[in-house]
């Protein structure tokens, strides 16, 4: 269809593999949480690691960074992965003690959008519509919710025997609003960097953040938690002596509005 556009801001790069008998206790002291999904922040700017259980013994580990970080390193994919995780000693030791059961795989240029989300006789859902970043599995949320929301317009289109673009207007409006919220949230996440952990653990904001992460972003109402995140970023940015100032990420976006 020729609708795909590369995201002008997010230029992330991921290297990942599967490991057998990785000791998940290295990520938490709580035995009830060893099989949770974990995110590990790394010292390298805008870089983090995912830890996702696949089976009882196999774990997916992936390093996500800005493409320029990898390019500047001059390292192979394998070496970059190990150099990155080496900055988290407990994670590195646990990985080295496990068995890598899949070769490293790279993912690049995966942040994109579409000029339109629907047209005569077609609707784009999930990754076919938009993908920003793998953080918090937002792509899974968009896929499930876009399919759910599209089904209403599709059923009505079949009932009315009208498959013109206008029949999918409600879907397009809701999805664009939801994607806008995800985009803004992910941008703020990278700017807050490691400070996001302090924010999400604050009881004043925790429930609102969890609702957002569960996909409650499509209603059309302004999400107050995003305004709170903006306030914190602005406060820290404006004060070079702020205790948190040196921990801010360097991803700057003039506007949180997606370009498409």
Language-model features: locations:
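Tryptophan-centric aromatic hotspots in well-structured domains and transmembrane helices
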Residues: 15-19, 48-51, 110, 122, ...
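FAD-dependent flavoprotein oxygenase/oxidase catalytic domain
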Residues: 56-57, 65-68, 90-93, 99, ...
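Predominantly flavin-linked oxidoreductase catalytic cores and closely associated redox partners
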Residues: 1-92
């Amino acid at each position: 269809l020729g609708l795909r556009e590369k995201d002008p801001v997010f230029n992330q790069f991921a290297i990942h593999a599967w490991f057998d008998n990785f000791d998940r206790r290295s990520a938490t002291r709580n035995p009830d949480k060893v099989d949770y999904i974990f995110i590990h922040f790394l010292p390298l700017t805008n870089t983090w690691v995912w830890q996702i259980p696949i089976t009882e013994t196999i774990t997916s580990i992936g390093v996500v960074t800005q493409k320029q970080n990898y390019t500047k390193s001059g390292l192979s994919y394998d070496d970059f992965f190990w150099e990155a995780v080496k900055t988290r000693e407990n994670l590195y030791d646990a990985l080295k003690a496990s068995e890598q059961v899949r070769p490293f795989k790279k993912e690049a240029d995966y942040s994109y959008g579409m000029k339109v989300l629907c047209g005569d006789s077609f609707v784009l859902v999930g990754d076919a519509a938009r993908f920003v970043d793998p953080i918090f599995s937002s792509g899974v949320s968009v896929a499930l919710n876009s399919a759910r929301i599209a089904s209403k317009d599709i059923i009505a289109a079949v009932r009315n025997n009208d498959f013109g673009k206008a029949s999918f207007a409600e879907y397009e409006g809701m999805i664009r609003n939801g994607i806008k919220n995800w985009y803004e949230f992910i941008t703020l996440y990278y700017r807050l960097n490691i400070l996001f952990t302090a924010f999400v653990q604050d009881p004043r904001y925790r429930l609102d953040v969890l609702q957002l992460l569960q996909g409650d972003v499509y209603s059309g109402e302004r999400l107050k938690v995003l305004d709170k995140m903006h306030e914190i970023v602005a406060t820290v940015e404006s004060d070079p002596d702020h205790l948190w100032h040196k921990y801010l990420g360097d991803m700057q976006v003039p506007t949180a509005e997606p370009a498409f």
